Amino acid sequence: MFWHQPRQQQLRQLQRAASGAGKHQRRSPPQTLGDDGDAAAQVPPSPTGALLAFLNQHASEEGGAAAASADGRVSVSPGFCSSILPEHSQDLFAFSDPTSASPQPVPMDASLSLFTPPVPDCGRDVGEEAEGAVAPSWRAPLPAPQWRPVHGPSWWLSSSSPSGSSRGSVTSPQYSGEETSDAASGAPTPPPQSSGSSYVYGQALADLMAMIQEIPAPPRSVPDCRRGEPVSEDGMADRCETDASCYTTDEPMEAEPSEPAGGVSWLGERADRMRADQSPRGLGAEPHVAEAGRPSSCVGEERADVVAIAAVEERKEAARRSPDAERNDDEEEYESLPCAQEFFTSQELAEINARAIAESDEAEDEDAGSPAARSQSSPFPSLGPAVFVLAPTSAKSSRGMRKKAIAVSRVVPDNDGEPDPCADGPGRDHVSSAQSAGANGALETETSVPRSATAPAGAVAACAQNTKRGYWRGAAAGHAEEETDSDDEDVLVVDVSACAEPFESFAQRQQPRQQQHAPRNKPARQRLRAGAIVAAASGNTLTVPSEPPHPSLAPLWKMLNLWLSEEWPAQGGGQDEGEAAVSASLLAPGSLPELPDMCPRVAVGIISHALAVDLSAPGGRITVDEALLPKPPAADYVYYGKTGYRPSMAAHPDVRRAAEEFSASDAAARVYVEEFGMAVEQHERLVAEFMLQPLSRVSHSYGGSRLNKTEKNLCKICLPPDGGDDRDGGGKSRGGRGGGSKDASRTAMATGVPHIVHAMRDGRAALALPHLMDVIRVCRRYDASQKTYLLSCLRLAFAPLVFPGASPPVGADDSPWPTSPIRECAAALREGFRALNDIRAEQDPPADERSRELALPLDRAITAARRVAATAAGLLNAVGASVVHDGRVGLPAFFLRGVTERREDLFSAARRCPRALYSWERSMRATTAALWGHLASRGPIAAPVADLEELSQALSAVLSVTSVPDGGDVRYAFAEADEGWRALAVMLGGGAVRTSSGESGDAETDAAYALLAPGKQSSAGVNHPRGRPGRATASSPRTPASRPPHGSAAAPPSGRDSPPGALNVPEAAEEELRLAAARDTTGDLLSDEAGTDDDGDAPVVISYVGPSSPPGVEDPSPDGLAALRPLPEGYVPRPGDVLRGDPGADENDDDARAPCRVGDASPPRQLPSSSSFASSSLASAVPGDPYLPRSVAEPTLCRLAEHLQSDDGWTRAFANDPVGLAEFARRSTPGRRLGGQRRLDQLLSWTRRHSPRRRYSLIVLVSEKRPGDFRERAYAAAALAGRACVPGSACDPETWRDAEDHPSPSADAQSPLRSRPSRDCFPPRIAQPEASDDDDVGEGGTALLSAGDIGFAGAVESMLRRALSRQGQACAVVDARDDKDVLSAAAPRFPRGKPGLIYLRVAPPSEACVANLPSLGPSASPHRGVGGKHRDKRPCLAEGTPSAPSCRDAARATAPLSGDPVAHRLLMHRPAKPLVGEEACAALLGGKAGRRGQDVPLPFLTAATLRKVARVARELDPGWGHGDLGCESAVVFPPAAPPGPELADRHADRRRSTKGPQRPGGKRPRSSSSSSSASHDRSPSSSSRRRDGRPSSRRRPSRRMSARPPSRPPAAVILRASWRYAEEVAREMLDAAASRFDEADGEDPLPPAACGGKPIAPETLVALCEQRGRGPTSLPRAPTPRSGEALAAPRRSGAKDPRQGQYCPSARRSEAPHSPSPRDVALRLLERQQELNRQLLLELRRGSCEISPSPRRRDAEGRRFGCRQDDDDGYDYEGGRESPERVLGRRQSRRDSVPVRRRSGAANCGGRWMISAGRSSSSSSSSSSSSSSSPSSRPSRSATPSLSPSPSPPRRAPVDRSRSGRRRERDRPSANPFRWAPRQRSRADHSPDGTAPGDAPLNLEDGPGRGRPIWTPSSATTLPSRSGPEDSVDETETEDSAPPARLAPSPLETSRAEDSEDSEYPEYSNPRLGKSPPALKSREARRPSSKQPRRPSSGKNGHTDVSAASAFFLGRPAPGSCGRRPLGARVRGGTER
């Protein structure tokens, strides 16, 4: 609709229509406009007719009754006005108070004048842009908006019609159309229809207009302008014509106070002044106005006509109507018109006006008694004429002559509707006027004005404006050749118009006063400043202020005055300066002290027009000219590029589908096309996302965001590469998107930002934010950090526009309750501090300006300090009393009640007030008093202490919530209030000092402190001890019933730490004694001096409980007040506080009296519990916890069940948790339930996320930093799923918080999102991270609980009871709570020794989540050089992708030492500090910067940790006790380690990978770290997008880099104590494990005495658990073999061929009578190991050997080396050396001339030792590798079993991957990551069989336990041989030799073997994963087929690998079977060394 278009666009359309209509001849017949016009209808061929057509169209659109007649009148109903005023009451001019809540409505009974405002074009001429456009030059804007018609005279509204109906009529004084109906008949004529938009602006001037006083009737004749003869009105019409462009001028005017009717009478005064001042020429500073008649006392009694007098050349009426004259009018009108100066002077004008006024008086008397006049004047009276002389003008003619003229216009009414003999037509008077404007001429028009339509009853206003040649050029259309003659000349004209009343009711109210009208005296004249708008709307007089109305408008106001001063010269010019002197007098910025200032709204409107920006519009709107906008596209085209178009693709099915998805979602589209049709909505969504999301998500790269397939397809459809259609200059030539064949989705353009034309049409400045953000993004001048700064500034600048409700904090004076006692005390305190300042001002300033203490005389200082302190104490008491008083009814304090009653979301913030107000720490009381005085006075005061400013800022921030309006945004206020509360808690908690220097004050200051610590009896008769915590004063003995009604928010819990202000410091004790003495001397001060006020008001009762209660309210007792006082959140009693429920009291008395109210502190004893499990110290109470008596527990449980709306599962948990039940009762009391409902739902949200009927095998406990914060829970959920907690993902804390705001159904409800039971820990209403098929975390149920949840202890107890109730079930508790959390230290207490309970202590989850943000800037490239675009392929968080690498993968990808600078940020940490190098590694480990070399206190909560803990919990035998596991040890897989000193400031290159022909460049997918399962990396490479086009949360396999420096290679180890060394299996543990297998031994398998008090690692427990399954019942005794015979291989009935590696679960084991006992094997193993260790230590001491990394590795700075994270190789973390076990293993491997491939497991008992049964598979050391693969070299079945040192497996071939995905082997030895440098040994030192000379083979026949099968320790180590060269067995083999001895498989191995048919290692298959490890599977796939099945051995030589437990737990292939080469192996010539 036309009315909803921008203002300038409406003006442009109106001006074009008027200019186009003005080209037609005046008497041409009506024409029909084409498509380019406004309508295809009959339009009058004149500018006036064009405007009339617009008006008629608007009247018909608005539904008002409209009728047009040929005489230029349009009659409309009053509904026309009612439809205009409400819609446009604030568009241009609204005189209402901007500070009020709602703008004042425009009065409907005011006169309405329809004016068109000017086009505010700053500093340029708009007339040249459009054809016929009329626009002023605004190079000199005025301090007021100007309202003038663009063409034609002014419009006004009349409500009288000839037929007597009271319909409004819009009348034009100028209309040249033919007569189509009789004007007197009143028959309405249908208005001309127009298809275009209508235009009218009337209400703005209507507000300025008031009803004018009565003006006498016009004369019947006027004198001739040239001859001085009176001529008739129709004769005047022959030679006078009214100019179509009557403009207002800045003419001084007079105004008087409005009458009761609301009008002004200034025309009469104008006439008096003009009559008195008879200037000869009228060219001075004061123009002349003739007498306009005497003013009347009433408005609207008589009819008045506006008389226009013009001096022009007389023309013949017949000649004017001839066709020839019409043709020559345009050619001759400017040359034939002489200047107006030649016709009359100012004296003549004065005489003419005087004569007209005299005749008007005579006509008034005649018409008064005429009945016809009275009948026609009803309902509107007739008004007298208004004669107004225009300002002097000058123009420059074509002859170069400077002319001065005065333009006057006149409108003559008809003679009561009778036909005039001199007129052309019956019943009409033709009024013509012409204006001489020098050589420029004027546009001649004429009009017919019926008398009935020219009865004005409104107000008159004059607006000044300096009109430049642009207006005249538009007015004189077709005469552009003469425009250069008036470049520097100004034409000042004025237009006087009047308005009529639109409603009949107002006129009827004025009728009884018509006959009682009597003239009255004129008021005093009031001279107005030129350019000021005089308006009397509803009795308010408004003028332009001389000063800016608001400080924020001062810069704009100065600029406006500067424009005026530059454009207009100073005042004082003479008469010869022409209009310059007049302009100076009109527009000089002089002072007007006698006038009132304009309201700020008007000033804002003035500056808005001057700057072409609407400053008053809500949200800030900017008006854009319609001519600057591109044309709307055609039907089948849309906007494209800058100004181009392209064909619309709305019919495409993909586009339609994308449009439906966009309209259905609430997020912004990453690809927006014009076919969506929601450009404004997309703009708004982009603005919201930019203002709320972290800046790290904003792309800093030049290219656009990465799109998925669906979005790229949409770009391909709608954004063709050829640039689109070249229609109307669009496409590539006009800046079209894309060009050539370049993909539009990867260009620098923003695919999600719509075309800017939509934002320009909307006008809101906030919609430009996405475009500005994109401009910063694509700018290549700034880097990422600079762009972040610019975006931050952009966000700060646009914050008031996006969040208009955010307002600055206010003080106590803005309290909505002026009668609050807080306000009264604050006022008294302000007076006291003002007195202090006055005393200080009298004294000389101290010499030391740094001194903040008062330098006053002693007596005056004491008096002032006492008064201030007493007032401050009263203020604080009033605050406390307000809280107590409101606490009884459940409302906050008085000064917060008004806010919290309107906003429920503010209640939570208001409830935190008692937290600081209850804190009464003596060290800061005087500062608090000064703070309140500062807030009350809002001015700088003399601070008596040093930290006044800090406290002032804190409490100002706290009170910011009181200033939030009803509809405002409270997020900023909440954030500011939280900061204030934290600061107050620190300062008021005793952390701040009293003075800046720390010195004690004098006696006067001590007295002031004593006043604020009342220790004596107060006026209320209540004694409250307020001494130091932990110490009671002598004057206030403590009693069991006196409970301190306050709690320190910053005080630590009792029994753990001492408070910071305890009396353990001697200085504190001395200060207490000094204050006690001062308290005795000033004890009566409160009652004596502070009892009455200075003004004699009522005394202020000073007491701790506050002032007396209001009248009629019973004052409760002190005990009642103390009991009703609510406890602050997080209340913890301090040491020495006496709590209710004294332990010494009788329990019966306790229960009978029920001393503990709801929410009171509990007695320090064991809480009653009906559960035996709870009585085992799982849940215990500490002093200060909320306590609920038994009598109140049952009703509270019923109310809890109603609140939860679920079954009684969690109700039983609350029954066993009295603390949680009491907390619920305290928060759900009837008076508080309404306000705290939202917070209570958040604290009970865990009941909706967890089902009470589920068994949870993994419980994760976290701590919330602040109430309602789900950050730690979200990070724990991210760790569970192995995802990163990026903003916008399912693990985003904001998503959790939003989900909690909307209550969701219980966890039992079937939800499509709850597809897997492992997702039970997520809120049901949010998108959850997708878990891979291999992710088995939470299969048995995972729970996420916070220590701040209500019922936390009961929930943990219930979950543990249900999880451990099943036989054979274990439950793991991962405690990730913060040590600083008070609630975490209190409960729950887990039972010791509970079967099946695994308790692990880890660091908070948020400390382990990091991300790698690579730099994408130009870097040095070997191929492209420096500056070439080198894209970093390292993994990073893709923009807009919720899925991100997991914590451990992101940590591995972290490369702080890489060549390019990489920024490491802690996600969701504000502010995000970039961490590089050592700080990044320290952040990865959970430490802080600068903590290098320190131990990490706790391990991380990673996905790998949880996965292994969950697996241990499922597979561990619950019969074993693991309670001590949580004391010192935990499972940790550190993602990185801090770099060594040699690499602190250097860089490291990326680790190389194996190169192959199919993988050029060595790029092949790497497996994940050891912290993940072995099958985790075998998941197929999923796409980054799903089918629906949305980002997928699956991790994409990419190249990972390790952040391990060479000196500290971390491994997957079991950390204990100092968290630096691996777990070692002690001898006692093996003895205890072996003793368990004795049938007579029934004790605990691992008693604490056997472990020596040390904890046991879970990996060791798993291994021992496997061995325990092979007990005496499952392992029968085997026959003892003879010497030289091997053990028979165990056979199973029903099993498959054992050589195929397949076993049947029901297979039987064959007896092996001769097998050593596990105890014997372990003892011999340990003895041999100790002997080897001793030898190694001796060599190390002699210095004959050293342990150092390889020199090649040491030189390669960028390579990670050492063992992988899953290589638990016993590396010594304490000293940075290898363990002796590793040295021994390397020595043995070097003797065998075969490098060690793999290190040992967790036990670290040696190198690669294998159990060999029978003779070696090789005949000699030289032929070991060749004989291992031949069939003849297989061991004989009859070989005698023996334990001999076995060489390591042969060298593996390099791994290469073909296209089929299988690996091929090549002969390649494995590399040793560490170089062993022993002393040189000769070849003779080695025996021929490869064993050392000193090594003796192990005699299996010796020692007890013969006949038992060989027991293999679970430490993944094999037993070394003790046999020497002389005892070695013959290495030759026979075909009938016995196979090697195979160990009896454990039940765990048996279960794994069922699902691993394709693997040769059944014991290493993981049944939970459902797949075999990738390395094993690939080996099985590439092994050549053989007719004879292979034996189930892990080695090539028939040896058995027994590291199944360790390999399975670590989630990796067994040692020796890894599909990858060891970390650190180097490749040279395709062979690994």
From Swiss-Prot:
Pfam families: Herpes_ICP4_N. Residues 732-741 have a biased composition (Gly residues). Residues 223-240, 313-326, 1294-1303, 1575-1591, 1752-1765, 1774-1795, 1853-1869 have a biased composition (Basic and acidic residues). Residues 1592-1602 have a biased composition (Basic residues). GO terms for biological process: DNA-templated viral transcription; positive regulation of DNA-templated transcription. Signal peptide: none annotated. A long stretch of serine residues may be a major site of phosphorylation. One of its GO terms (cellular component) is host cell nucleus. Residues 1912-1921 have a biased composition (Polar residues). Keywords: Activator, DNA-binding, Early protein, Host nucleus, Phosphoprotein, Transcription, Transcription regulation. Residues 1-16, 157-173, 507-518, 1031-1056, 1169-1181, 1812-1843, 1937-1948 have a biased composition (Low complexity). GO terms for molecular function: DNA binding. Residues 359-368, 1086-1097, 1927-1936 have a biased composition (Acidic residues). Residues 1-47, 95-145, 157-199, 218-240, 277-301, 313-338, 350-461, 505-527, 719-747, 1015-1064, 1085-1186, 1294-1342, 1420-1451, 1531-1612, 1636-1655, 1664-1718, 1746-2033 are annotated as: Disordered. It comes from the Viruses. InterPro entries: Herpes_ICP4_N. Belongs to the herpesviridae ICP4 family. This IE protein is a multifunctional protein capable of migrating to the nucleus, binding to DNA, trans-activating other viral genes, and autoregulating its own synthesis. It is required for the switch from immediate-early to early mode of gene expression. This is Major viral transcription factor ICP4 homolog. It comes from Psittacid herpesvirus 1 (isolate Amazon parrot/-/97-0001/1997) (PsHV-1).
